[in-house]
């Protein structure tokens, strides 16, 4: 009796058809953008709290920055999604307005996280090009999404991505 070994190995999740797979990938991309929006809100709220503490010492700079944030004219950090072959890369962008060579536009700062395009797994970055080994969260799990999409739970600096 001849048995094809690979045919009977359990490979985890059952195979899904192409339409369902493409819909899941689209959902993951939307979730990644929502995570970026949440990180931007976290940075905004963190900046407001920081400048309010500074303003207590009668700092004109802090008061000016608070007004810019309230008016929507402040150049706060942005988080953008860059699509790769296997991963979505969430990149922190900073406004370049310092020094003699200032470009006065947003430039890439650092990688905040990697998201697997097929599974929705969220990884801490190991470098600019690759994620760390262990999965931190999964965007397809409702409980993880509820946690990640609350600006009070995530940190713009990535502290929530350390092993828990």
How should these model regions be labeled?
Residues 2-16:
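Short, Lys/Arg-enriched N-terminal segments with co-localized hydrophobic residues
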Residues 144-164:
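C-terminal partner/receptor-binding element of secreted or periplasmic proteins
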Residues 119-149:
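A short, surface-exposed interaction/processing loop segment used at functional sites
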Residues 12-80:
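Negatively charged, low-complexity tracts enriched in Asp/Glu with abundant Ser/Thr
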Residues 68-113:
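Exposed beta-strand-loop-beta-strand "reactive/processing" segments of non-cytosolic proteins
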């Amino acid at each position: 009796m001849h048995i094809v070994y690979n045919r009977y190995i359990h490979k985890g999740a059952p195979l899904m058809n192409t339409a369902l797979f493409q819909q899941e990938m689209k959902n993951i991309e939307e979730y990644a953008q929502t995570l970026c929006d949440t990180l931007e809100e976290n940075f905004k709220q963190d900046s407001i709290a920081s400048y309010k503490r500074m303003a207590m010492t009668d700092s004109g700079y802090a008061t000016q920055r608070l007004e810019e944030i309230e008016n929507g004219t402040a150049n706060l950090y942005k988080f953008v999604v860059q699509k790769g072959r296997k991963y979505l890369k969430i990149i922190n962008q900073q406004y370049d307005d310092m020094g003699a060579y200032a470009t006065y536009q947003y430039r890439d700062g650092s990688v905040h996280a990697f998201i697997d395009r097929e599974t929705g797994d969220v990884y801490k970055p190991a470098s600019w090009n690759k994620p760390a080994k262990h999965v931190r969260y999964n965007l397809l799990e409702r409980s993880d999404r509820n946690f990640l999409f609350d600006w009070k739970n995530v940190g713009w600096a990535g502290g929530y991505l350390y092993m828990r």
